[in-house]
Amino acid sequence: TADIDFTKEEPSAVLNYNVEIKGKDYNNITCKVELFDEEGTKLSETEGSEGTFEISNVRLWQPLNAYLYKIKVTAGQDVYTLPYGVRSVRVDGTKFLINEKPFYFKGYGKHEDTFPNGRGINLPMNTKDISIMKWQHANSFRTSHYPYSEEMMRLCDEEGIVVIDETTAVGVNLQFGGGANFGGERIGTFDKEHGVQTQEHHKDVIRDLISRDKNHACVVMWSIANEPDSAAEGAYDYFKPLYDLARELDPQKRPCTLVSVQGTTADTDCSSQLSDVICLNRYYGWYFGGPDL
């Protein structure tokens, strides 16, 4: 994580690191951590699995203007290098601030598929997608509706693309298709008897997502779910522990949201009480409304 001092004319930062080492005799493994700038010049070096780096006149990771330091970890014979962008994110009233400056999201609910490969990874198409986004003056996308490949996340770090990172929880909503029918019994989405296992699995998905993507500068917000039955009875009790878990796990304490299905309203949708940012799905020109966008 980075603690950035914006009070100076040239911001400075303190990077706090914690290296988790697993395996046989991990307690006896010596750990060395080095910090390099983007040109490869070593700025600092320290020993131990926990510590800090101080950077004066820090180069910030900015939307569409990325700067990535390199953190090199040597643990025994293993070496791992992490590109790391220094930036801050917070919500202040109606403003979404990146590096203490208001940010306006211009982009898409994207999908990670291509004509030649389907859901298979295609690195040139990833590069093409980002190039088209920049040509259209877009600056961001949501990973609708699943975590994207690590290669795409690294590319967004490098290109300064802002990402709303979403779990695989799409359509936690038994009202789709006329409602669920279990042996002739209609039940609600968050029926306490049937929904416990779903919530526990949902927690696992959040843990996996944040564990993998927590160090990506491009990720500025976590999306807990897409199009859930968030206005239904029991929705608040289902989602509040999930928001609490995400906020607990994320060392950067990024904002959290869920993206509501069209038709829900702020007075009934539980996300209006839980989310740092209200996100709404609107399908004009996609499912209905003709070609005018």
Residue ranges of predicted features:
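Secreted/periplasmic carbohydrate-active enzymes, especially glycoside hydrolases
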Residues: T1-V163, V205, C218-M221, D237-E248, ...
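Substrate-binding/catalytic cleft of secreted carbohydrate-active enzymes
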Residues: I130-I132, S140-L293
